[in-house]
UniProtKB/Swiss-Prot annotation:
Keywords assigned: DNA recombination, DNA-binding, Plasmid, Transposable element, Transposition
Pfam families, per the entry: DDE_Tnp_Tn3, DUF4158
Family: Belongs to the transposase 7 family.
The protein's name in its UniProt record: Transposase for transposon Tn1546
Entry function: Required for transposition of transposon Tn1546.
GO biological process, alphabetically ordered: DNA transposition
An MF annotation (GO) of this entry: transposase activity
Keyword DNA-binding: yes
């Protein structure tokens, strides 16, 4: 059936891919393996070709679901698998069907025997109704097409022509969009519509070169009071449109997110070209999502300002101590001399003043005392007493913060919100005195020491306000206080499955522990005690392990890579052809098809040949950090506008993740990577990047030198593929991000065990990884300082008693076991990200029973791990090798990301992640290209001389000396490389 071009969803290549029969063991086993009944029906035919033809017809109706006449080609391996089951020659299929009637008779019999249904108007209506409902939830055409085919297959409906399915999906999606747009548009008033028109047509008053929409989209600069006020100005502008009254609560979250992302990409001129309902709806949904982002960004700036306030206090104290160090030392010497004189006078019953003046002149003594009084800091001093003058820097924005943002809390935190209301009221009324009955119980002891004036009753306005704003920050971060209209700072319980939902679903949970606390604690105690008993019996037999005098120490591991392996690896790399990075990327695109994942965000169309070259250039521009402008200058025939367009519309987060998954999955199916690992273990490590622009997401960390930066946190499999990456704050603990990568990568890797450095672990992460079924194995620095725990009494293990310094609180685990499982289940099912919830659990104000219980469960796992770690040198080596692979990956990453002195120049975290993802794709492309050509080199070595297969375990596919990263960038789309026509080795 021919369909209107506007309703085509697929390219010819995509249609072929949908109808292709994969040579997949799972597909063969599930759909093409015949039962005894199947064989009885097949064998009713006398001729071999008819038996095989009938069997093949049955097989393809099961999968992919089209009639035999629609299938253009069937892989030889599939024909062989089917023919072997029925005992005929595969070649007999060439003679089927001799008569066309035979083919149709067979199809009719299959329909009758197996209850297959022909696709008629009735099936069309049923499927369309199903698709329409799905399209209200997800507008992705490819997703809907997959769902459509799965639905028909599940209901044993024979698939019609794929163009019919395309038209049905197109119409269902169009009808769903029309319904959605009409619903949203109808709930808008004429005044709201006029305001929406205004933001895409009117220029911003103070920025004549920008529309109001362009102004609203501006990324924030560095966290400062001025930036805060600019964000609030935009937030209040959107609030002034009263869009909260628009009816969108019944719309599916996924669909809202898709439309919001589209809204963020469209320029004002594009909106003006849309039909009214579509224009108003997408704008409204985008602006409502933008209010959440602006609310979160505003509070994030407050978070940073409080951190900056406290940091400046600490630095001021350090500076005082540095400046006064010499004088303080002088006073200590005076005190020592005077003290010794006084002791002598008392013991020898001498005149105190004469003895005193013998060591220090009286006037000098008086001056020293006066100077000491000036140098003296308050008893139990910290730096908070130095913050009095810093109060006014907060006042630049905090009245606006308290006026614009609305806070809610549980009853336990009402005193804090009462204090917020008091300060808000004082700001509005202009009163300067804090009421005497203002709540103070929620304020920490540190702040309370500075809360009152010298009379002991009058509350100091400056310190009260700073204390309240600091406590507000902590409680919001912890989830005890929520912000109305926020996405990131909601009530803690809102992130989890409700107790009712948990009780209904916990029978099907994917957690790795028993739902019964008694079963859980019995099993863990048994594992715990088994390790302790073994170590107690064998502690003297472990090489490189010392447990003397209550100190646990390990000898440094010797390198285990033989020199022969290094020479062998070098000899293989010498055989690899030199190649430009542009050609390498095109080779890998031809071989893997990863570029096809860059579908257009608006119309879902895959890139054509010309667009593919533009995408490759944009990938290099971002992944090498030279930028799109420089890339356009260095690439003949391409312009900046072309690169900017594909980066905006094709290289969005979901497309980048899918392209990355294609590469990782392809690499995982090759043979050579299995010498390096089986794809079940991985490591993660951060690569700190300097930021060359002011950004809300930039942090300073003295550990990494001067300047502010962000961290690319990368996950590396044991096969040298980079399967997940994200941007995190430099001062964020790596540990809280570990589970994001393990749970949310989209590859075929089945990661069971994960390694990190010391920064990658906390007790709570140990607990959660166990609950979610992962083995967690960090390399712990200063192992001798680690606190080991026991469930039973440490005295039961006298040889180990000195290193067992704590006891697990099983009572708190028992009391909170259900809630801990509910938390873990919520993370596993994606209700909340692990990093978000772990950040809240790590906040000091949320050290409640749930956080404590998870920490205690983690201490069990950490202790078991450390016992295994010191008992097993092979485990220590495995962790070391895993981390070395991540470090090697970072080495390659830095070589590729050479532009702009390796600095990120993007302000928003989304654009920073786009650069990091492009870098990851290039890394994986290099790993694949090297692996393929190293495989060819290995095969050549096997044919031409002696060969030690064990040396392959020590290789890496991350070498880059043969790859030209520099120069003018040409992309040759005419030279098509395949697995059967790789570039020739360099043998001379």
């Amino acid at each position: 059936m021919k369909i209107a071009r506007g309703r085509e969803l697929l390219t010819p290549e995509q249609r072929q891919a949908f109808m292709q029969i994969p040579e997949d063991e799972w597909i063969l086993g599930t759909y093409f393996t015949f039962s005894k009944r199947d064989l009885e029906i097949v064998n009713k035919r006398r001729r071999e070709e008819n038996r095989l033809g009938f069997a093949v017809q049955l097989a393809v109706l099961r999968y992919p679901g089209w009639p035999y006449t629609h299938i253009k080609s069937i892989p030889d391996s599939v024909i062989q698998y089917i023919s072997k089951q029925i005992g005929v020659s595969p070649s007999s299929l060439d003679h089927y069907p001799q008569r066309e009637n035979t083919l149709w008779d067979h199809l009719k019999e299959i329909r009758s025997e197996y209850d297959f249904v022909t696709f008629t108007l009735s099936e069309y209506r049923m499927t369309f109704k199903y698709l329409h409902q799905l399209a209200l939830e997800n507008g992705d055409a490819i997703h809907l097409l997959h769902e459509c085919i799965d639905f028909l297959r599940k209901n044993k409906i024979i698939l019609p022509a794929i163009t019919t399915l395309e038209r049905m999906v197109w119409e269902a999606r169009a009808m769903a969009e029309k319904k959605l747009f009409n619903t949203v548009s109808k709930s808008l008033t004429n005044e709201q519509k006029e305001k929406l028109e205004g933001i895409i047509t009117s220029q911003h008053p103070s920025e004549s070169n920008k529309t109001i929409l362009g102004w609203l989209k501006e990324p924030p600069g560095h966290p400062s009071p001025e930036t805060f006020l600019k964000i609030i100005e935009r937030l209040e502008y959107i609030r002034g449109m009263d869009l909260e009254t628009v009816q969108i609560s019944h719309l599916h979250r996924n669909r809202l997110l898709q439309l919001s992302r589209l809204g963020s990409r469209y320029e004002p001129y594009a909106f003006r070209d849309f039909q009214e309902n579509k224009r108003y709806s997408i704008l409204t949904i985008y602006l409502l999502q933008l209010t959440q982002e602006l609310t979160d960004k505003a509070f994030e700036i407050h978070d940073r300002q409080i951190l900056s306030l406290l940091s400046k206090g600490r630095k001021a104290q350090e500076e005082i101590q540095k400046q006064n160090g010499k004088k303080l030392n002088e006073k200590v010497i005076h005190f020592t001399n005077i003290g010794q004189a006084l002791i002598k006078a008392r013991e020898e019953k001498l005149d105190v003043f004469k003895v005193l003046e013998s060591v220090i002149e009286w006037n000098t003594f008086v001056s020293s005392v006066e100077e000491a009084q000036e140098l003296a800091r308050p008893a139990d001093y910290d730096y908070l007493d130095l913050l009095q003058k810093r109060f006014y820097s907060l006042r630049k924005y905090t009245p606006t913060l308290l006026r614009v943002l609305e806070f809610h809390s549980t009853k336990a935190n009402e005193p804090l919100l009462q204090a917020v209301e008091i300060i808000r009221g004082m700001n509005e009324s202009g009163k300067r005195k804090v009421p005497d009955d203002s709540p103070v119980d929620f304020i920490s002891k540190r702040w309370k020491r500075h809360l009152y004036e010298d009379d002991g009753t009058t509350i100091n306005r400056h310190y009260y306000e700073m204390a309240v704003l600091t406590e507000l920050r902590e409680h919001v971060r912890a989830g005890d206080v929520s912000i109305v209209g926020s996405r990131q700072y909601r009530d803690f319980e809102e992130y989890l499955f409700s107790e009712d939902t948990w009780n209904q679903s916990k029978g099907n949970t994917r957690l790795s522990v028993s739902l019964s606390f008694e079963d859980y604690i019995t099993e863990r105690t048994s594992s715990f005690n088994e390790r302790l008993k073994w170590l107690a019996a064998n502690s003297n037999k472990l090489d490189g392990v010392s447990l003397e005098k209550g100190k646990l120490s390990l000898a440094r591991l010797e390198k285990d890579v033989p020199e022969e392996a290094k020479k062998f690896s070098a000899s293989l790399y010498q055989m690899l052809p030199r190649i430009k990075l542009t050609d390498l990327l095109m080779d890998v695109a031809h071989i893997t098809g990863f570029h096809e994942q860059f579908t257009h965000a608006s119309n879902n169309r895959k890139p054509d040949k010309e667009e593919t070259i533009i995408i490759m250039a944009a990938l290099l521009g971002m992944g090498m950090n030279i930028g799109l402008s420089k890339m356009a200058e260095a690439t003949p025939g391409l312009t900046y506008k072309q690169l900017a367009n594909v980066s905006q519309w094709r290289m969005y987060e979901d497309a980048m993740n899918k392209a990355q998954a294609i590469l990782v999955n392809f690499h995982h199916k090759l043979q050579l990577p299995f010498y390096w690992g089986d794809g079940t273990t991985s490591s993660s490590d951060g690569m700190r990047m300097q930021l060359g622009v002011s950004s809300l997401h930039a942090d300073a960390n003295p550990h990494y030198g001067t300047g502010k930066g962000a961290t690319i946190y990368r996950f590396t499999s044991d096969q040298f593929s980079s399967y997940y990456t994200k941007i995190i704050h430099t001062n964020s603990r790596d540990a809280i991000h570990v589970l994001d990568g393990l749970l949310h990568h989209e590859t075929d890797l089945n990661i069971e065990e994960h390694y990190t450095d010391t920064a990658g672990y906390t007790d709570q992460i140990f607990g959660l990884t166990h609950l979610l079924g992962f083995k967690f194995a960090p390399r712990i620095r200063d192992l001798s300082d680690s606190k080991l725990f026991t469930i039973d009494k440490a005295s039961e293990y006298p040889k180990l008693e000195a290193i067992l310094r704590g006891q697990i609180n099983t009572k708190v685990i028992k009391e909170n076991y259900e809630d801990v499982l509910r938390l873990a289940h919520s993370i596993r099912e994606g209700t909340v990200s692990a990093s978000l919830i772990m950040g809240k659990l790590g906040s000091y104000s949320r050290q409640n029973s749930l956080a404590t219980a998870l920490r205690e469960m983690g201490r069990i796992e950490k202790t078991i791990f450390i016992l295994n770690y010191i008992s097993d040198e092979s485990l220590r080596r495995k962790i070391q090798r895993g981390l070395n692979k991540g470090e090697a990956m970072n080495g390659l990453a830095r070589a590729i990301f050479f532009g702009k002195q390796g600095e990120l120049r993007e302000r928003t975290i989304q654009h920073q992640l786009q650069r990091a993802s492009a870098l990851n794709i290039i890394i994986n492309a290099i790993s694949i290209w090297n692996t393929l050509h190293l495989t060819t080199a290995v095969e050549y070595k096997k044919r031409t001389g002696s060969f030690n297969e064990d040396l392959l375990h020590h290789m890496s596919p991350l070498g880059w000396e043969h790859i030209n990263l520099l120069g003018e960038y040409h992309f040759n789309s005419e030279k098509v490389v395949s697995l059967n026509s790789l570039r020739p080795l360099k043998l001379s």
